[in-house]
């Protein structure tokens, strides 16, 4: 036994090496933990075959120990409810199994005391009481966030036209004092969600006012009284008046300050204009707002109510823009209920009731596709739009030459899926465009997609449904039902009633179906078949290397690198004792680096041979063999023989075999010449026996 104070001893089950965890048994060994603080010996952990053995199987140097983990789990039946801990050294990881949890904790505590390990901070599971608690001022920090973020979180479930800005009551004064221009307080306004039973015309009044903006709209200033009878920015005025919603402030008063707001386009709500008042007076929505209330003015400035509408030639009718319910109510006094929506605009006259002055063509040509209008349609969410292609615009001009024409809104780039849904319905009512106006000759009926997985091409026009070709044959015959092919096609006229249209044509048989099925030769009687070889699959590497893993109760202990620096690895690490039971015998360890044993003259020879300093140079003696490759092909040329460098500093790369191509004719000539020379030499020596042979 080695010296040192015995700190702990007991029975433990030891794991085999990491690469043999699945194939070798975990054997029970007697472990002894020794501390050399008093005697000066190293701190070691020894294990013996039994408790009365005198020679240890192996000695584990604890100076090389890096970490100790307690409470591991191993995916093996015999270790399901075991108490496993490991000792992680530089050379190997030792997994040890204790009989009880107290014994495991005792071993771990003793080893950590000797090695100076402390619990690491990388424990995956923390005590329930150690979870971070929210500070007392956390709700205050959350409430003092920008109101815009609170509004987004509170109104995330509402549709886009009803994005409300909700400010807590205790933050109203705080937000106004800090910066009242950062956000808009809609305290004096009320909004409500749209009813599910609203009609399409009523839903046209609840479009968002924050979709478009342009510099063509007049600024929100109080216009002069002389502007009340003139068109503004290409729009006609209207005699109807809409008032702003009532303010809850008691000091608000009614004033005659007006906001002249232009109107937007709409495909389903058109203004009703009498011929007598069309030329003299246009239509304009005038909003009467109190000038004494600064909050309403600030509100109206922040609400984006501008349009991307350039001036249009002629008397083009503009559809009035609608606002969400509650934002602008139909009231003339401030004490009226603000939840009443504005009145529905009058329906348009028939085409024959209007004067020729009211009719104008579409102000955008087919080439002006980049400067089309960008106006959201009322009654829909801003993500939907109405689109008319260039070909459809040309047809629209032909069909509506004597009818009313309207400015067509441009599609939003975010959504191109919806095309002319409401616009098509409106023109179908007005008899401007019929359902079958698009001729079927213009549709490509014979289109065959090259990609069999691609769906049939959808036409850009949505006036009519795409014509489904009954006899459409795709490129791949596997995806087509040939049984229904030609059933709707009548027979040719010259055939008469010889073939019934209900009789399907003969189904073509693919070439692959004509091949006979494979024959199983093993089904023949009295057939002698060799048994299939037994497949022994090697154990996968990941299964061999599978080791005990960490669990939620695993605790790790390691040395603090800042306080206890790692000592350098000693020269003699490996044990010289036998370990036949665990296959850890290392008595015959041979270093892989030959430089460690270069002083041995019996292995590699002297370094001074041939002036070389490398121990890998082979000694040049009588037994050095050179190989010659005899090539009997006379057509090949003989390459020059390389000279080996024998000076100082020759490397291992120079010690290689040179292969020489030998010519057959030259070899035979040399052989005959040498034989003739040898015969002549022997005859000469026989005549003069006194002459010594050189």
UniProtKB/Swiss-Prot annotation:
In the record, which positions carry N-acetylserine? 2
Listed A to Z, the keywords are: Acetylation, Deafness, Disease variant, Non-syndromic deafness, Phosphoprotein
Q: Give a Gene Ontology cellular component term annotated to this protein.
A: cytoplasm
Q: Which Pfam families does the record associate with it?
A: PH
Look up what happens after changing residue 387 to N: In a breast cancer sample; somatic mutation
Family per record: Belongs to the GAB family.
- What is this protein's record name? GRB2-associated-binding protein 1
Q: Which organism is it from?
A: Homo sapiens
Q: Gene name?
A: GAB1
């Amino acid at each position: 036994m080695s010296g040192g104070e015995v700190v702990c001893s007991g029975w433990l089950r030891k794991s085999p090496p990491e690469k043999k965890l699945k194939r070798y048994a975990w054997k029970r060994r007697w472990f002894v933990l020794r501390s050399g603080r008093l005697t000066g010996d190293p701190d070691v952990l020894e294990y013996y075959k039994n408790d009365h053995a005198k020679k240890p199987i192996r000695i584990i140097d604890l100076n090389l120990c890096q970490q100790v983990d307690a409470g591991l789990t191993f995916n093996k039946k015999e270790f399901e409810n075991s108490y496993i801990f490991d000792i992680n050294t530089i050379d190997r990881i030792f997994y040890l199994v204790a009989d009880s949890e107290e014994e495991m904790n005792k071993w771990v505590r003793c080893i950590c005391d000797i090695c100076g390990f402390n619990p690491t901070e990388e424990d995956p599971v923390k005590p329930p009481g150690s979870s971070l608690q929210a500070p007392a001022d956390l709700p205050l920090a959350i409430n003092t966030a920008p109101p815009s973020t609170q509004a987004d979180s509170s109104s995330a479930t509402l549709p886009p036209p009803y994005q409300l800005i909700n400010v807590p009551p205790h933050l109203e004064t705080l937000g106004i004092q800090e910066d009242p221009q950062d956000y808009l307080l809609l305290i004096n306004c009320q909004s409500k969600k749209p009813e599910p039973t609203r009609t399409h015309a009523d839903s046209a009044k609840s479009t968002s006012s924050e979709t478009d903006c342009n510099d063509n709209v007049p600024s929100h200033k109080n216009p002069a009284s002389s502007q009340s009878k003139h068109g503004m920015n290409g729009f006609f005025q209207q005699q109807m008046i809409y008032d702003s919603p009532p303010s809850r402030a008691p000091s608000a008063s009614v004033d005659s300050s007006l906001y002249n707001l232009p109107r937007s386009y709409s495909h389903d709500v058109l203004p009703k204009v009498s011929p007598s008042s069309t030329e003299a007076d246009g239509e304009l929505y005038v909003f009467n707002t109190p000038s004494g209330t600064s909050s309403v003015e600030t509100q109206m400035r922040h609400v984006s109510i501008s349009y991307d509408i350039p001036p249009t030639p002629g008397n083009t009718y503009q559809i009035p823009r609608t606002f969400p319910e509650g934002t602008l109510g139909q009231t003339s006094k401030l004490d009226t209920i603000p939840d009443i929506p504005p009145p529905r605009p009058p329906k348009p006259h028939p085409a024959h009731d209007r004067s020729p002055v009211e009719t104008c063509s579409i102000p955008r040509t087919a080439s002006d596709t980049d400067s089309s209008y960008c106006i959201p349609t009322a009654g829909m969410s801003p993500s939907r739009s109405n689109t008319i292609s260039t070909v459809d615009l040309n047809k629209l001009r032909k069909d509506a030459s004597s009818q009313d024409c309207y400015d067509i809104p441009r599609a939003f780039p975010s959504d191109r899926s919806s095309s002319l849904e409401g616009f098509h319905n409106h023109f179908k009512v007005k008899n401007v465009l019929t359902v079958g106006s698009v001729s079927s000759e213009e549709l490509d009926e014979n289109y065959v997609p090259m990609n069999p997985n691609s769906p049939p091409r959808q036409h850009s026009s949505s006036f009519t449904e795409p014509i489904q070709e009954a006899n459409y044959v795709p490129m791949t015959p596997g995806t087509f039902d040939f049984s229904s092919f030609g059933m709707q096609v009548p027979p040719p006229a010259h055939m008469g009633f010889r073939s019934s249209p209900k009789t399907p044509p003969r189904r073509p048989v693919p070439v692959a179906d004509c091949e006979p099925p494979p024959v199983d030769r093993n089904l023949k009687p009295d057939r002698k078949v060799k048994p299939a070889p037994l497949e022994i699959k090697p154990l996968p590497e990941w299964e061999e290397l599978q080791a005990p893993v960490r669990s939620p109760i695993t605790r790790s202990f390691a040395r603090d690198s800042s306080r206890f620096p790692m000592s350098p690895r000693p020269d003699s690490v490996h044990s010289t004792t036998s370990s036949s039971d665990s296959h850890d015998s290392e008595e015959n360890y041979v270093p892989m680096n030959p430089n460690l044993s270069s002083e041995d003259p019996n292995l590699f020879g002297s370094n001074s041979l041939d002036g070389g300093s490398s121990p890998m140079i082979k000694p040049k003696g009588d037994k050095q063999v050179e190989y010659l490759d005899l090539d009997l092909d006379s057509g090949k040329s003989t390459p020059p023989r390389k000279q080996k460098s024998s000076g100082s500093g020759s490397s291992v790369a120079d010690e290689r075999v040179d292969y020489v191509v030998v010519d057959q004719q030259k070899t035979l000539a040399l052989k005959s010449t040498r034989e003739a020379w040898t015969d002549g030499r022997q005859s000469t020596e026989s005549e003069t026996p006194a002459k010594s042979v050189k």
